[in-house]
From Swiss-Prot:
Modified residues (3-oxoalanine (Ser)): 83
Protein name per its UniProtKB record: N-acetylgalactosamine-6-O-sulfatase
CDD domains noted in UniProt: ARS_like
Family membership noted in the UniProt record: Belongs to the sulfatase family.
PANTHER family assigned to the protein according to its UniProt record, in alphabetical order: N-ACETYLGALACTOSAMINE-6-O-SULFATASE, SULFATASE
Pfam families the UniProt entry points to: Sulfatase
Post-translational modification: The conversion to 3-oxoalanine (also known as C-formylglycine, FGly), of a serine or cysteine residue in prokaryotes and of a cysteine residue in eukaryotes, is critical for catalytic activity.
Biological role: Exosulfatase involved in the degradation of the glycosaminoglycans (GAGs) chondroitin sulfate (CS) and dermatan sulfate (DS). Catalyzes the hydrolysis of the 6-sulfate groups of the N-acetyl-D-galactosamine 6-sulfate units. GAG-specific sulfatases play a key role in the persistence of the major human gut symbiont B.thetaiotaomicron in the host gastrointestinal tract.
Enzyme Commission code: 3.1.6.-
Organism expressing this protein natively: Bacteroides thetaiotaomicron (strain ATCC 29148 / DSM 2079 / JCM 5827 / CCUG 10774 / NCTC 10582 / VPI-5482 / E50)
């Protein structure tokens, strides 16, 4: 029996939820007609970063092909403007701000999804799917108190519904810089144990702060701890030298692991949850992409990301799996340009606009924080088209359960709504509202033409990245139909709309 016992509210007035009270029912029916499902989370990719969304300074032909063969959304949203909470929301179907400890996770964080909760992977596994996760994880590993990377790490992704796990524990700018496969660090020498700490230095490995002469990619802010591959990271580590990744090889390794999972399960329905490291910092493209975009390393890793998507598509083609595979491509949050390294991302933009026409970006309550590229392809069932309806990533869980006619416990995926026909481009009915969350847990709500951002005493500007966070002590209201760039706060002109949306947001919090 699954239940969630540690869901504690972060914000005043937020109702305590119980999550999932019981296991989903096993589907023992025929699997032959069930579609394969691949969900690909790019990292920090903006709606303006792809040529199918209007970018003119960089070309993404593989993703463009995916969009041309599927449903391309223009009003799709991540649940949050940072990585960990967006991933939490997708897999649990619950707004991350309802639970403590769902902010940006350090590399030695405990698993933040309760193993008693029914996840989307649980649901699909019970529906007869082989389930796998490959790539960026960033939801913690191990028990409360921190991760021991030197033995079998448990709980892990296999504890919450995944049959197979090959993951980057956190982000590529955070230690430990190793891969974990089915609970074990890949290539670890037991005579060279790993120690990780996010509070103080451990061991004698050089750091960016103490040994700047050893750094090949200098930090612009924040990244001055243990140096791995000439790149200073967030956090300190020592040991595990034989297990350390090479940054320029990460995309190849993740892509090949994803392809291997597909090949291994080609005869049965499978669910692959794939998290790329691109285009997150540090941006270290493979040599075959380095210098090819004309936009510096950020542009180069966009090309690398596009190659990754092309490899997945080509694998499906070669196995004749394309027609009956639902392939969803999106980003965990909006873009950021300078996120901690002196990689000339600003200087090399050359007119490229990662945020598109939208204000803000990663970390922000403004539109570019959570309005993301979102493409769905299923050739057997879905006709190519453009989708302008409001849609949230949090609704993937309930929508896939509806597609598979898979019953859920009453309290599973409490915030996920079934919008299957919208997801598949068969109708254009919008979600009633979208809730957005920024770095500081400030919430915004979009309904119809209006967007309301609740008052907040948090900083207006993120200290390190200089990103506008959307925080203001006064209510903010924007008419997105007339002002999609959120230039004019019209809260004073429309107090009745402010009151309506404020009350709606409060009702969502306490639901």
């Amino acid at each position: 029996m699954k239940n969630v016992s540690r869901l504690l509210p972060l914000l005043p007035g937020i109702a305590l939820l119980t999550g999932c009270n019981q296991k989903v029912q096993k589907d023992n029916g025929q699997n032959s007609q069930k579609p394969n499902i691949i969900y690909i989370f790019a990292d920090d990719l903006g709606i303006g970063d792809l040529s199918c969304y209007g970018a003119t300074k960089v070309s993404t032909p593989h993703i463009d092909r995916l969009a041309g063969q599927g449903v391309q959304f223009t009003n799709a949203y991540a649940t949050s403007a940072t990585s960990t909470p967006s991933r939490f929301g997708l897999l649990t179907g619950m707004y991350p701000w309802r639970q403590e400890n769902t902010g940006i996770a350090p590399g030695n964080s405990e698993l933040i999804i309760d193993t008693a909760c029914v996840t989307m992977a649980d649901m699909l596994k019970e529906a007869g799917y082989a389930t796998g996760v490959v790539g960026k994880w960033h939801l913690g590993l191990g028990p409360k108190g921190g991760t021991d990377f030197n033995g079998h790490i448990t709980p892990n992704a296999q504890s919450i519904g995944f049959d197979y796990e090959f993951v980057i524990p956190a982000t590529v700018d955070r230690v430990p810089c190793v891969f974990v496969e089915n609970g074990h660090v890949v290539g670890l020498d037991p005579n060279d144990p790993i120690t990780v700490n996010y509070e103080h230095k451990v061991g004698d490995w050089p750091t960016g702060e103490e040994n700047p002469e050893l750094v090949k990619l200098k930090p612009s802010q924040g990244h001055n701890n243990t140096i791995i591959n000439g790149i200073p990271r967030i956090g300190w580590m020592t040991g595990g030298k034989s297990a350390l990744w090479k940054d320029e090889d990460i995309a190849d390794i993740i892509t090949n692991k994803a392809k291997s999972f597909i090949v291994s399960h080609k005869e049965e329905p499978f669910f692959l949850y794939m998290g790329t490291q691109d285009v997150h910092v540090p941006r270290v493209p493979h040599p075959r992409f380095a210098g090819k975009s004309g936009l510096g390393t950020r542009g180069d890793v966009i090309l690398q990301l596009d190659w990754t998507i092309g490899e997945i598509m080509n694998t499906l083609d070669s196995l004749q799996l394309t027609d009956n595979t639902i392939l969803i491509f999106t980003s965990d949050n909006g873009p950021v340009i300078d996120d901690g390294y002196q990689d000339q991302a600003f200087e090399r933009l050359n007119g490229h606009t990662p945020m598109g026409i939208y204000r803000g970006g990663k970390y922000s309550a403004y539109e570019a924080g959570t309005r993301i590229p979102f493409i769905v392809r299923w050739p057997a069932k879905v006709k190519p088209n453009k989708q302008q309806a409001l849609f949230s990533q949090i609704d993937i869980f309930a929508s896939l359960a509806a597609l598979l006619k898979q019953p859920l416990p009453e309290d599973a995926a409490p915030d996920s709504q079934e919008h299957l026909n919208t997801l598949l481009g068969k109708d254009y009915t919008s979600r009633e509202y979208i809730v957005q969350q920024n770095l500081n847990n400030t919430l915004a709500i979009v309904k119809g033409q209006w967007k309301y951002i609740e008052p907040s005493d948090a900083p207006a500007i993120e200290y390190w990245t200089k990103m506008e966070l959307g925080n203001d002590r006064h209510p903010q209201l924007y008419d997105l139909s007339a002002d999609p760039s959120e230039k004019n706060n019209v809260a004073k002109q429309h107090p009745e709309v402010v009151r309506e949306l404020s009350e709606l947001l409060e009702s969502v919090k306490t639901r």
